[in-house]
């Protein structure tokens, strides 16, 4: 079963950056770690993306075969963890929890 996350997209367009949020679907078994990401707020303020400044973000690290991918997701690490954890089997939860 896949879970839905809201990903912060940052597209460099030369002198400006286009910042948006889009829905993505992730296999929860591929999630390696989830950490709160306070650096997003300062970046959004610097980029004048004030519509997202009052939101919380976390860094989600996922394993894809030979490589890992990090995304900035909307929500606290606890909120995203609860979403991921609710879709995992008990044996997979044990691995995620350490």
Model features per residue range: what roles?
Residues 1-98:
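Eukaryotic intrinsically disordered, low-complexity regulatory linkers and tails enriched in Ser/Thr/Pro
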């Amino acid at each position: 079963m896949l879970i839905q996350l809201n990903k912060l997209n940052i597209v460099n367009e030369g002198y400006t950056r286009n910042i948006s949020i889009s829905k993505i679907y992730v296999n929860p078994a591929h999630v390696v770690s989830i950490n709160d990401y306070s650096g997003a707020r300062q970046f959004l303020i610097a980029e004048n993306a004030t519509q997202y400044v009052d939101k919380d973000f976390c860094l989600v690290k996922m394993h894809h075969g030979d490589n890992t991918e990090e995304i900035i997701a909307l929500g606290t690490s606890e909120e995203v963890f609860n979403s991921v954890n609710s879709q995992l089997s008990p044996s997979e939860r044990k691995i995620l929890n350490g």
